Amino acid sequence: MEAELAATIRAGWPAGNESPGTKSAQAFTLIEILVTIACVAVVAAVLLPAAARSRALAKRISCCGNMKRIGLSFRTWAIDHNEHFPMQVSVANGGTMELAASGAVFPHFQVLSNELSTPRVLHCGADTERRCPTNFTSDLTDGRLSYFLNMDSAHGDGPSLLSGDRNITNRATAGSPLVSLTKGTSIGWTKGLHSKQGNLCFADSSVRGCTNGAVGTFLQIHAGVTNHLAVP
């Protein structure tokens, strides 16, 4: 009788010494894992774009800081040079006036090495296509710079555009190394650096961020005045 009962129990017992309900417990655990993975994926889909936007905003804020430093450096230099920026002072007197027509940007920053202190402020963190310059001599070239300069900017002229992100559009002026801007010129930002947004620095060292549609308004270009931008 006992032998028959034992045989009956063994016949109904799962193979591999598994207790009843083990498979269902394992299946439930697998479902839990899949649900957890799905939840993590949803959270990541929500948070990652927000994190990317936060990083982009941080880089743009840092870029504004760079431009503020550039603007203040130009103003400091002008105090020691009869209220003129380097572009209006002869090379013989420590300026870069004779170099302005070449379209090169780096010489104008080189003469500001004392005021800028470090060449790192000439590179935007969002400018991943270019490497940050390490010194003001051998490593400072247009290929290391993130910012353009307006050759016609004047110290004391608040609305005068001084500098800005290099991803400005309409940069190709036929037969000239400089971009010529007058009132009504179509201007904007490319997708690079700040995703069709950008920062502008003015002669009074103020910095303004603007969207693609507002950049023309912020430039404040007056009728009859032409601004020549050297874009690296």
Task: Label each region the model flagged.
Residues A78-I79, F85-Q88, G94-T96, E129-N135, ...:
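Short catalytic/ligand-binding loop motif for oxyanion handling, primarily in non-cytosolic enzymes
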